[in-house]
């Protein structure tokens, strides 16, 4: 069984975000388990020390990392894939690990400490995306790749 954990920073999400996440998570059939870990964003204001906030959020992310998972940071500077390339990449990753952990940062992204811990860095787009939407785009992309691997008609 492939486990996919998504660690993300964020506060209470709108219903449409939760609906989108749940919709794609339930589409995966037997053999793939999806888990979302949401870490509350630390409070920010105009005088916030963003470096200190990033450091604290990094500690919370590190505490949530599952043991023995392949860590993949979502980062603007990461590698991007077409749907077919992502399907191939997922096939390769399943040979390496039975647990993939995707990490989505907050408004300031991820700290260098977290990026260094990760085995890979992926980018979903060159666009700046709202962090709540990234959850849905990631799951849809993974589902599409799974559909390609399994010759499911979703991708066609």
Swiss-Prot record:
GO cellular component, one term: cytoplasm
Gene3D superfamilies associated with the record: 3.40.1280.10
Annotated keywords: Cytoplasm, Methyltransferase, rRNA processing, S-adenosyl-L-methionine, Transferase
Entries under CDD domains matching the protein: RlmH-like (cd18081)
Reactions that this protein is recorded to catalyse: pseudouridine(1915) in 23S rRNA + S-adenosyl-L-methionine = N(3)-methylpseudouridine(1915) in 23S rRNA + S-adenosyl-L-homocysteine + H(+)
UniProt-annotated location(s): Cytoplasm
MF-aspect GO terms: rRNA (pseudouridine-N3-)-methyltransferase activity
Record-annotated disulphide pairs: none
Broad enzyme group: transferase
The EC number(s) this enzyme carries: 2.1.1.177
Keyword ATP-binding appears in the UniProt entry: no
Binding site for S-adenosyl-L-methionine: 74, 105, 124-129
UniProt key word Chaperone: no
Subunit structure: Homodimer.
Function: Specifically methylates the pseudouridine at position 1915 (m3Psi1915) in 23S rRNA.
Family label: Belongs to the RNA methyltransferase RlmH family.
Designated name of the protein: Ribosomal RNA large subunit methyltransferase H
Originating species: Legionella pneumophila (strain Paris)
């Amino acid at each position: 069984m492939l486990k996919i954990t998504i660690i993300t920073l964020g506060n209470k999400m709108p219903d449409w975000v939760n609906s989108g996440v749940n919709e794609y998570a339930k589409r995966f059939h037997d053999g793939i388990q999806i888990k979302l870990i949401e870490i509350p964003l630390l409070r920010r204001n105009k005088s916030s020390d963003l470096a200190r906030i990033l450091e604290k959020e990094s500690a919370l992310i590190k505490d949530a990392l599952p043991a023995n998972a392949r860590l993949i940071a979502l980062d603007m500077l990461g590698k991007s894939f077409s749907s077919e390339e992502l399907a191939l990449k997922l096939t390769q990753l399943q040979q390496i690990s039975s647990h993939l952990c995707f990490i989505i940062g907050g408004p300031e992204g991820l700290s260098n400490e977290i990026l260094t811990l990760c085995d890979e860095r992926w980018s979903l787009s060159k666009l700046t995306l709202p962090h709540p939407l990234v959850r849905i785009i990631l799951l849809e992309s993974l589902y599409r790749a799974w559909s390609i691997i399994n010759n499911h008609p979703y991708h066609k």
